Amino acid sequence: MATLQQIYSLYDTATWATQLGVYSFYTTDGSLSYLHLKTNVPVSRNTMWMVEFVGYAYGGAANIRTAIVFHTSGSVIYRIGAQNIYPGLTAQTAYTSTDGYVVIRVLASSFYYTGFVVNAYSTAPYTPNEVFRILAVSQNNNSGTGTF
């Protein structure tokens, strides 16, 4: 069973540009490969974000350091890009939930005893000053969209 919890977070209260330790994730279930994380970022708002995952995947014997960037505007997610530094977790894509929020999909080398923290960075001066949150998470074998 996956655990998602808010942990101590650090924020730049002037701009909310850097938000460290937004959430932590830990699971021992190695049978499911994908994680879908529903955020509080509405696709209809004009924003730019980089979301970073840092941790360790024991089952895959690999460090985790991956990030995904995206730009939302006019109910579309633009310029989705991912950079995977270590192979423990791969940021794959972002898609729109049925209620209009950004969902991030990641793939693990193995979720068997895997843990990571999530950091968020607003990457445009017009991104609203708001706290980035993970609203819901689903660990499953869905390699597509539609989990949320």
How would you name each of these model-derived features?
Residues M1-F148:
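Trimeric viral appendage architectures of receptor-binding fibers, tailspike depolymerases
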